[in-house]
Amino acid sequence: MTQLKYLLLVSRQGKIRLKKWYTAMSAGEKAKIVKDLTPTILARKPKMCNIIEYNDHKVVYKRYASLYFIVGMTPDVDNELLTLEIIHRFVETMDTYFGNVCELDIIFNFSKVYDILNEMIMCDGSIAESSRKEVLHHVTVMDTMESNDNLERVLS
C-alpha cells in the first residue's frame, strides 16, 4: 500500500503551484523540504532517474510540460513505480477535467485541483480511488451541487 508524505507541484521557475502534506510536520520542516528539493530537482537533467533519496524518505518526481510533480514517500513500504503511476493518473484526471490542463488551470482553479486530489488520495496519504472515471464523476457531482447552491442563494 502506498503511503505518501507530501505532494508538491513546482513550476520550472521554482514557484510552488500546489502543495499537500499527508504527514504532520512543523512549518520549519515543510519549508526545509521545499527549499532543499526545489533546486535539487530543477537542476536534474531529463535523462536522470526520477527517484532520489532525501533524509528519511524517498522522493519521486515527474515533469509534465512546465510543472514538476514531486511526491515524498515512505521508504521500504512504497513502490516507486506505483507512485509514478499515481502522479500520471492525477495528471490524466486533471487533463480530462480541464481539457488539456496547463499551469494556468492549476493556478486559477486550485480548489478544483484539490478536489480531484482529495478524491484520489486520502488524508493519510493512501490511495482512495484509482479510477479516473469515478474521480471525475464525484468532482462533477460536487460541481453540480455547488452551482445549485449558488443559484439558490442568488434567487433567495
From Swiss-Prot:
This is AP-1 complex subunit sigma-1. Keywords: Cytoplasm, Cytoplasmic vesicle, Endosome, Golgi apparatus, Membrane, Nucleus, Protein transport, Transport. It comes from Saccharomyces cerevisiae (strain ATCC 204508 / S288c) (Baker's yeast). It is found in: Cytoplasm; Nucleus; Cytoplasmic vesicle, Clathrin-coated vesicle membrane; Endosome. The lineage of its organism: Eukaryota, Fungi, Dikarya, Ascomycota, Saccharomycotina. InterPro entries: AP1_sigma, AP_complex_ssu, AP_mu_sigma_su, Clathrin_sm-chain_CS, Longin-like_dom_sf. GO terms for molecular function: clathrin adaptor activity. The keyword Membrane applies. GO terms for cellular component: AP-1 adaptor complex; cytosol; endosome; intracellular membrane-bounded organelle; nucleus. PANTHER family: ADAPTOR COMPLEXES SMALL SUBUNIT FAMILY. GO terms for biological process: Golgi to vacuole transport; intracellular protein transport; vesicle targeting, trans-Golgi to endosome; vesicle-mediated transport. Component of the adapter complexes which link clathrin to receptors in coated vesicles. Clathrin-associated protein complexes are believed to interact with the cytoplasmic tails of membrane proteins, leading to their selection and concentration. AP19 is probably a subunit of the Golgi membrane adapter. Component of the AP-1-related (AP-1R) complex, an adapter protein complex that mediates sorting of cargo SNARE SNC1. In contrast to the APM1-containing AP-1 complex, AP-1R is incapable of sorting CHS3. Present with 6370 molecules/cell in log phase SD medium. The keyword Transport applies. It comes from the Eukaryota. Adapter protein complex 1 (AP-1) is a heterotetramer composed of two large adaptins (gamma-type subunit APL4 and beta-type subunit APL2), a medium adaptin (mu-type subunit APM1) and a small adaptin (sigma-type subunit APS1). AP-1 interacts with clathrin. Also a component of the AP-1R complex composed of at least APM2, APL4 and APS1. CDD domains: AP1_sigma (cd14831). Belongs to the adaptor complexes small subunit family. Its main location: cytoplasm.
